[in-house]
Amino acid sequence: MVTAKMVKELRERTGAGMMDCKKALTETDGDMEKAVEFLREKGLAAAAKKAGRVAAEGLVTTYLSEDNKTAVALEVNCETDFVSINESFVEFTNSIAKQIATSDVKDVEELLESKYIADENVTVKEALTALIAKIGENMNIRRFEKLTIDNGVINGYVHGEGRIGVLVELGCEKESDILMPLAKDIAMQVAAANPLFLDETSVDEEALDKEREIYRAQALNEGKPEKIVEKMVEGRVKKYLKEVCLIDQVWVKNSDYTIKKLLEEKSKEVGSPITLCKFVRFERGEGLEKKEENFAEEVQRQMNQK
């Protein structure tokens, strides 16, 4: 059964009209992902809106070691934006990011059982439980990623008071003052342009085949002759790759440059090749469903806690 809530979610994810969303869900027996594909094939949904919508509160933060060789991106979730800017919550999140960077923990489960860096008398799990009791709101250490490099640097960028956090790893045999600002610029690019892949070699073939099928269906629905459909599909695939591969994206600070061209020019300045090794991009609440609440009731609940 197709519900109003399902139609609302599909509209938010695709930007398509209400009746189109209802039809898509009906045609796909209520399967949300298939409904998104259905709308795209009909040309009714933008490819850029395919990713899961952001619907949870919390904080994304980054931590960089003093030598810029180790870095961490971390997401900690909470229920409301009031808590995401709470001083105790922010301090806890920053402490956890530092703890991950300075320890060998491999995942969230191992992290929770380890001694808390700010108070070794308790575990991270116990510290989190105490913070939940103090603030009166559920919290969760959702995910983290740690990067390390020997030859090169790592820099980060946090956007929108912890809404998006990015790390960029640049490899280079020579040390240079150019590297850190360059990594920061590319991190800002990642935050703004949201690339899905580093370059074409890292593109998931299954995902690419899916895009081809969608473009093929779009072309056929437009009434294009079969003989030119394949050319159209490949043209759209090339455009898609330039949009989703970081190395091929147009630089947001100067449209005369792609990221590849920017790296080539900076490599000449440094006198040694600069390699874009990896990037990490966390967006707060990606793929999480936020419980819908009356705003006035939420404010009242926060006031009652004071």
Curated annotation (Swiss-Prot):
One of its GO terms (molecular function) is translation elongation factor activity. It is found in: Cytoplasm. SUPFAM superfamilies: Elongation factor Ts (EF-Ts), dimerisation domain, UBA-like. It comes from the Bacteria. Pfam families: EF_TS. The keyword Cytoplasm applies. InterPro entries: EF-Ts_dimer_sf, Transl_elong_EFTs/EF1B, Transl_elong_EFTs/EF1B_dimer, Transl_elong_Ts_CS, UBA-like_sf. Keywords: Cytoplasm, Elongation factor, Protein biosynthesis. One of its GO terms (cellular component) is cytoplasm. Residues 80-83 are annotated as: Involved in Mg(2+) ion dislocation from EF-Tu. Belongs to the EF-Ts family. Associates with the EF-Tu.GDP complex and induces the exchange of GDP to GTP. It remains bound to the aminoacyl-tRNA.EF-Tu.GTP complex up to the GTP hydrolysis stage on the ribosome. This is Elongation factor Ts. It comes from Clostridium novyi (strain NT).
